[in-house]
């Protein structure tokens, strides 16, 4: 059991499960991209970064900000550099392909981890399947690309190497995961604390796991307190501003948690931005979905609960209510941790394996369906509810948009609505509406993804361009306009 062997003959059931899962993931992810349900933030931004890295230059924030700053100041994500050569082949689909493959690999990590001992071995296919259908997994795949998904998929392999006491490989995986995003290292600090608790009886394990914890914490502090502020030319980590309820910086947050523990716990459950009434009870329903999907096992194996503490805090206390619920990529880290805790618990039950597995699968699918159908907002449903017709049905004829896109030269700078940026971003210069900058072309829809403008403001913008002597209308298709800057 010391080697991971992926022969089809030995692990045919796992390969078939993975193949079916990849088809499902493609239906979720690629369909959204084809139908313009991927956006400037974040797939467009990261695809534009791929282009820069593939041409041996640093990526910047010009796509979505007026000023041009190094993109590493926003998130210290080195995966984009690593994956950039693939963009020569897959273009705007590159990161979606990488993300789907990574999740498939994460399922194999679960499979081989459960294969380690006789008690959990009968559950390996069940565990793999449940992992793929977990609400956090599918929600992440339905929304663009994010590097924390790639990091999370290495967690089962990290657990596997720690369990085998393969400390060199475990450290290599730890470093790899840290490279995905600066806040992943904070998550890994708590993961290491949980593992320290789990393996406390083994002196050798304690020593190495404490080293992992120290490395993760040091990496996090160096990134957010020195490296990223230096790159940004700022005094502090820019994303601390998303947590005014905690004080807005790391020191204030720690002080608030220590001095007001009951209020801190209360805030994890209530809408702390009451002006957004549609998000009342959003956090409570998220916890309900998490418990039904297997989160109850975190209380039976509390060292796994320790691991998810920073994810809950960063998810539920931000001033962006869209992160509080079950949608988007903000629940992906729960997938490996909850699944592994769940399998550890049920593998000790003296019941029929298939009955247990089927019951767990029922609760997983039920919680996922509930999360997407009942907890997603009306404007999100077509993206997430992949088993219904609206997921495959565009709101308008997209052929006209694609014809207009084909008229834009590949080397031209372009500004477009957010929904179009995802497919246009693989070029030198691409800007999200309404940042015109030095764009040579503008592809604008009066109704599609007009944020941050209202429909009325967007129509006023289009009318102003039509009378602007520096622009000419190349072609109009229904509500979509292609403008070219005059020489």
Model-derived segments and spans:
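Membrane-interface transmembrane helices that cradle and orient dolichyl/undecaprenyl
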Residues: 118, 147-150, 155-169, 196-203
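Start-transfer (signal-anchor) and selected internal transmembrane alpha helices
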Residues: 1-27, 115, 121, 204-212
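Multi-pass, polyprenyl lipid-linked donor-dependent membrane glycosyltransferases
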Residues: 98-102, 126-162, 176-187, 330-334
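Extracytosolic helix-loop segments that constitute the early lumenal/periplasmic catalytic or substrate-binding loops
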Residues: 27-30, 46-71, 78-79
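Transmembrane-helix signature of polytopic, membrane-embedded enzymes
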Residues: 15, 94, 104-136, 152-153, ...
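Hydrophobic, aromatic-rich transmembrane alpha-helices
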Residues: 271, 280-308, 312
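Signature aromatic-anchored transmembrane alpha helix within multi-pass, membrane-resident enzymes
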Residues: 15-19, 122, 213-217, 348-378
């Amino acid at each position: 059991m010391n080697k991971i062997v992926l022969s089809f003959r030995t692990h045919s059931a796992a390969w078939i499960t993975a193949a079916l899962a990849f088809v499902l993931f493609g239906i979720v992810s690629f369909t959204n991209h084809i139908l313009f349900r991927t956006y400037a933030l974040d797939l467009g931004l990261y695809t534009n970064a791929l282009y820069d890295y593939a041409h041996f230059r640093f990526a910047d924030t010009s796509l979505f900000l007026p000023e041009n700053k190094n993109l590493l100041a926003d998130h210290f994500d080195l995966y984009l550099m690593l994956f950039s050569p693939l963009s020569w082949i897959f273009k705007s689909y590159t990161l979606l392909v990488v993300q789907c493959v990574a999740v498939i690999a994460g399922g194999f990590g679960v499979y081989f981890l459960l294969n380690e001992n006789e008690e959990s071995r009968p559950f390996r296919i069940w565990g793999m399947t449940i992992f793929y259908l977990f609400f956090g997994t599918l929600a992440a795949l339905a929304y663009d690309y994010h590097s924390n998904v790639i990091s999370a998929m290495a967690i089962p392999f990290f657990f596997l190497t720690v369990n085998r006491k393969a400390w060199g490989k475990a450290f290599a995986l730890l470093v790899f995961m840290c490279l995905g995003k600066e806040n992943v290292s904070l998550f890994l600090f708590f993961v290491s604390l949980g593992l320290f608790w789990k393996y406390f009886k083994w002196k050798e394990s304690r020593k190495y796991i404490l080293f992992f914890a120290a490395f993760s914490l040091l990496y996090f502090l160096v990134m957010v307190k020195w490296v990223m502020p230096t790159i940004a030319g700022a005094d502090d980590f820019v994303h601390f501003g998303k947590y005014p309820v905690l004080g807005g910086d790391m020191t204030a947050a720690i002080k608030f948690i220590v001095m007001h523990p009951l209020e801190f716990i209360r805030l994890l459950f209530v809408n702390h931005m009451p002006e957004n009434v549609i998000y009342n009870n959003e956090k409570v329903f998220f916890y309900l979905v998490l418990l039904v999907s297997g989160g109850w096992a975190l209380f039976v194996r509390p060292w796994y609960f320790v691991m998810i503490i920073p994810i809950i805090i960063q998810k539920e206390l931000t001033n962006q209510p869209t992160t509080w619920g079950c949608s988007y990529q903000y629940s992906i880290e729960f997938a490996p941790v909850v699944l592994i805790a769940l399998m550890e618990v049920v593998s000790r039950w003296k019941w029929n394996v298939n009955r247990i597995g089927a019951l767990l699968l029922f609760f997983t699918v039920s919680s996922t369906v509930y999360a997407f159908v009942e907890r997603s907002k009306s404007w999100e449903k077509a993206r997430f509810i992949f088993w219904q017709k609206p997921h495959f049905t565009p709101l308008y004829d997209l052929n006209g948009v694609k014809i207009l896109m084909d008229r834009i030269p590949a080397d031209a700078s372009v500004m477009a609505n957010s929904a179009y940026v995802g497919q246009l971003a693989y070029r030198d210069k691409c800007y999200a509406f309404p940042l015109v900058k030095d764009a040579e072309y503008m592809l604008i829809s009066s109704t599609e993804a007009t944020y941050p403008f209202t429909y009325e403001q967007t129509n006023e913008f289009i009318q102003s361009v039509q009378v602007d002597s520096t622009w000419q209308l190349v072609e109009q298709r229904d509500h979509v306009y292609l403008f070219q800057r005059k020489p």
